[in-house]
């Protein structure tokens, strides 16, 4: 039997999970202060959901999805991103009928067949927020500010917002046509995939990793030059809110993001703390996505980040400090003292982690357990307990003392 695991997945062992708890708890506490509520959607959906929403010309749909057929021949896909499932839940449950503004966040595993590298896996975990029902520019600012506040709460340094506007259904067609005309000049050097994108969605060529295409992108038309008055006004207001909040940003005219549904505001948050520029968060508006799925006209926007990548960055910056309650080991001399040991353990667990020994093992064996568990203290439950006396040993310094207790609750705070 092969006890290995497929490439691109990992076990998250107990010594790593405190990092995950820190990020997840920080997100929940902060997002809920901004009136976001948690949503949990299935990890697999009908494949059509992602083809229609994420976009059939995106790298995700064309190259990276884990798609399979169930026993009845229906095409299912492990979710490669979180937004389509949230929109599907919004429509299927008719949330729009009772909730004009819906603010949700999600935390969970996603799946993409891409080349594994540091901080990137084929099963990875995303944390994201979505807002449905608001088209005003302030909410664009709010989610960018929320992402920044979240990263700063985790003490991630040297953050910069890169922002752009892709326009709307009124002004986007002219930009698409300009892109198509520009790249058509170089059709002979485009890959087969990029030639297909040229005809179906030329914006996706801007995502191309083909080395022959990268220099061509430098002189490609920019969406900001094609914005209609409404989109210009919207974008200017977003930028003004960011200035008023003293959020530094850089307008990046070539930023388009890798998903087909984005409209107007798109952004990435990067950090340069590690030398090379690293994207940490990405997001934007998707004002037509709900309609794409057959729902009512509903503006929307959101952002997402990869938890594995964030943990890697925080570790490299030495920003993750995990503090766990002291571990107290209770060594039990005889079977008749087990009940009293249980009472002591119950009281101590108010403030500490507690591991119980066993009277069926010698004291020497129990102390070996305590050592291997890296215990901070050992409490000896022996004959002394009959006189309300406990011996406590600081397992780090070796210091010992006896304490007389009248009430087990006196043990809730041990100082030695």
Swiss-Prot record:
**What is an example of a GO molecular function annotated in this UniProt entry?**
ATP binding
Record EC number: 6.1.1.21
Write down the chemical reaction(s) this protein catalyses.
tRNA(His) + L-histidine + ATP = L-histidyl-tRNA(His) + AMP + diphosphate + H(+)
GO CC, sorted alphabetically, is:
cytoplasm
Q: Where in the cell is it found?
A: Cytoplasm
Query: A Pfam family this protein belongs to?
Result: HGTP_anticodon
Which keywords belong to this entry? Aminoacyl-tRNA synthetase, ATP-binding, Cytoplasm, Ligase, Nucleotide-binding, Protein biosynthesis
Name a single GO biological process. Answer: histidyl-tRNA aminoacylation
* Disulfide bonds listed in the record: none
Q: Which residues span the membrane? A: none
Complex formation:
Homodimer.
Write out the similarity annotation: Belongs to the class-II aminoacyl-tRNA synthetase family.
According to UniProt, the name of this protein is Histidine--tRNA ligase
The encoding gene is hisS
């Amino acid at each position: 039997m092969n006890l290995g695991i497929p490439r691109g997945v990992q076990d998250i062992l107990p010594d790593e999970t405190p990092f995950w708890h820190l990020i997840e708890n920080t997100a929940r506490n902060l997002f809920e202060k901004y009136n976001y509520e948690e949503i949990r959607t299935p990890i697999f959906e009908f494949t059509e959901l992602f083809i229609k929403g994420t976009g059939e010309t995106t790298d995700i749909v064309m190259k990276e999805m884990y798609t399979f057929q169930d026993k009845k021949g229906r095409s299912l896909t492990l979710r490669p991103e979180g937004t389509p499932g949230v929109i599907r839940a919004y429509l299927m449950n008719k949330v729009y009928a009772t909730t004009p503004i819906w603010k949700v966040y999600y935390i969970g595993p996603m799946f993409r067949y891409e080349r594994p590298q540091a901080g990137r896996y084929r099963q990875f975990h995303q944390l994201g927020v979505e807002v449905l029902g608001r088209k005003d520019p302030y909410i664009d600012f709010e989610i960018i500010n929320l992402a920044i506040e979240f990263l700063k709460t985790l003490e991630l340094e040297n953050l910069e917002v890169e922002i752009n506007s892709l326009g709307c259904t009124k002004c986007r067609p002219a930009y698409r046509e300009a892109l198509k005309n520009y790249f058509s000049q170089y059709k002979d050097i485009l890959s087969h995939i990029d030639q297909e994108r040229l005809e179906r969605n030329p914006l996706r060529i801007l995502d191309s990793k083909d080395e022959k295409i990268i220099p061509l992108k430098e002189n490609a038309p920019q969406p900001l030059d094609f914005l209609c008055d409404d989109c210009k006004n919207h974008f200017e207001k977003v930028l003004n809110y960011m200035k008023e909040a003293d959020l530094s940003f850089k307008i990046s005219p070539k930023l388009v993001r890798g998903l087909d549904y984005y409209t107007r505001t798109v952004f990435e948050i990067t950090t340069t703390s590690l030398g090379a520029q690293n994207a940490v968060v990405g997001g934007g508006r998707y004002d037509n996505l709900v309609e794409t799925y057959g729902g009512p006209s509903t503006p929307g926007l959101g952002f997402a980040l990869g938890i594995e990548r964030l943990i890697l960055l925080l570790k490299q910056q030495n920003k993750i400090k995990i503090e766990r309650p002291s571990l107290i080991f209770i060594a039990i001399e005889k079977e008749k003292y087990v009940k009293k040991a249980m009472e002591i353990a119950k009281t101590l667990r108010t403030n500490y982690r507690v591991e119980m020994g066993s009277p069926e093992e010698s004291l020497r064996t129990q102390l070996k357990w305590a050592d291997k568990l890296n215990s901070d203290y050992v409490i000896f439950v022996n004959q002394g307990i009959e006189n309300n006396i406990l011996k406590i040993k600081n397992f780090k310094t070796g210091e010992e003392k006896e304490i007389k207790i009248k009430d087990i609750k006196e043990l809730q705070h041990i100082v030695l």
